[in-house]
Every structure is written in structure tokens, then in C-alpha cells.
From Swiss-Prot:
Keywords annotated in UniProt: ATP synthesis, Cell inner membrane, Cell membrane, CF(1), Hydrogen ion transport, Ion transport, Membrane, Transport
Complex formation: F-type ATPases have 2 components, F(1) - the catalytic core - and F(0) - the membrane proton channel. F(1) has five subunits: alpha(3), beta(3), gamma(1), delta(1), epsilon(1). F(0) has three main subunits: a(1), b(2) and c(10-14). The alpha and beta chains form an alternating ring which encloses part of the gamma chain. F(1) is attached to F(0) by a central stalk formed by the gamma and epsilon chains, while a peripheral stalk is formed by the delta and b chains.
Regions crossing the membrane: none
Main location class: membrane
Similarity field: Belongs to the ATPase delta chain family.
Location in or out of the cell: Cell inner membrane
Organism: Zymomonas mobilis subsp. mobilis (strain ATCC 31821 / ZM4 / CP4)
Top-level taxon: Bacteria
Protein name (database record): ATP synthase subunit delta
InterPro entries: ATP_synth_OSCP/delta_N_sf, ATPase_OSCP/d_CS, ATPase_OSCP/dsu
């Protein structure tokens, strides 16, 4: 498997690579990916969790306790739970989204898949994800893994990033272009 140097060079990439290698060694790549997905979704949706992860007011022990409480609720596997505790203990939980994204990229590289980062104003339904995956697969002529994130600031529509390519169909972008056109 060829690992992208730019991913590996980042802090999140190094943590993701370490987790990926252990998961691969233990035959738990998919289990860890599923658990990271659950935590990533919780991280994206729970403002309090993001604040806790990025806040220097709470001690690392408090963050570790919060993670320990979330693990059974989200049904996170043991390896991922230990990894999340490590991030909390090292004060690196704020880097989780980058780590999860890099891990997904390692999995995609292993499987010769393409990863599409999709940003929407509201969470995509399973049906919408399936439709988008099928259309991207048809266009790219390769298996595609969707990395969906929610950013209400785009107002509507979606932004799709595939490697260095980006398709911005967000309402925010369209309003910005309209405002620029009106300015002359």
C-alpha cells in the first residue's frame, strides 16, 4: 500500500497511521473504521463534545471520563476506545476529525478506492449517500467512499472534494458569486 506523504506528515496523519497499522495487525480495520465513523458523527453533531475536546479549561482526566462514558453508548470497539483515551490523555482529541479523515484515506488506499469529502448543511440520509456514491462511482469508474460532514454555514447544497478537485454547489457559494456579480 502506498501511503500519501502529505497525510503521513500531518499530526492527524501520524496518529491515523499508527491506529491503522495496529488495526491492520489485529485484523480490525473495518471494526475500527466503523467505530471512528460513529465517534466522528457524534463529534460533528454534539457541539458540547467539540468544545470539550478543544477546551483547555477541562482537565485531561475530565475529558477521559467523558470519552469513557461515550464509548458504551456509541458501541465503540476496544481498540478505538483505547485510541480515543490516548488522544484525550495527550490533549489531542481536538484533532479527531483530521485523524478520522486520514484513517479513512488509509483504508481507501488499501482498497484502491477514491475518497470523496462531502460537506452539506444537513446530514445526508442513507439513501442520499447511496445515490451520491453510485453517481460518483459511475463518473470516476472506481469504488468511492463518502466522508460526509455537516457545515450549516454553507446554507444548502453540497461541496464535494475528490483529491485536489472541488465541486462547490453550496448556496453560500452561489450567493457569494451573485453578490460579486452585483458589485460589478
Amino acid at each position: 500500500m502506498e501511503i500519501s506523504g502529505s497525510i503521513q506528515a500531518s499530526l492527524g496523519g501520524r496518529y491515523a497511521l499508527a491506529l491503522f497499522e495496529v488495526a491492520q495487525e489485529k485484523g480490525q480495520i473495518d471494526t475500527v473504521a466503523a467505530s471512528l465513523g460513529k465517534f466522528d458523527e457524534a463529534f460533528a453533531q454534539a457541539r458540547e463534545l467539540r468544545l470539550l475536546a478543544n477546551n483547555q479549561i477541562f482537565s485531561r482526566k475530565h475529558v477521559e471520563k467523558a470519552i469513557a462514558a461515550l464509548v458504551p453508548v456509541l458501541a465503540i470497539d476496544d481498540l478505538t476506545a483505547k485510541f480515543l483515551n490516548l488522544l484525550a490523555a495527550k490533549g489531542r482529541l481536538g484533532a479527531f476529525p483530521e485523524i478520522a479523515s486520514a484513517y479513512r484515506q488509509y483504508v481507501a488506499d488499501l482498497r484502491s478506492e477514491k475518497v470523496a469529502d462531502v460537506i452539506t448543511a444537513h446530514p445526508l440520509s442513507d439513501e442520499q449517500k447511496s445515490t451520491l456514491t453510485a453517481r460518483l462511482k459511475e463518473q470516476l469508474k472506481a469504488d468511492v467512499q463518502i466522508n460526509a460532514t455537516v457545515d450549516p454555514s454553507i446554507l444548502g447544497g453540497m461541496i464535494v472534494r475528490l483529491g485536489s478537485r472541488q465541486i462547490d454547489g453550496s448556496i453560500r457559494s452561489k450567493l457569494h458569486m451573485l453578490a460579486q456579480a452585483m458589485k460589478g
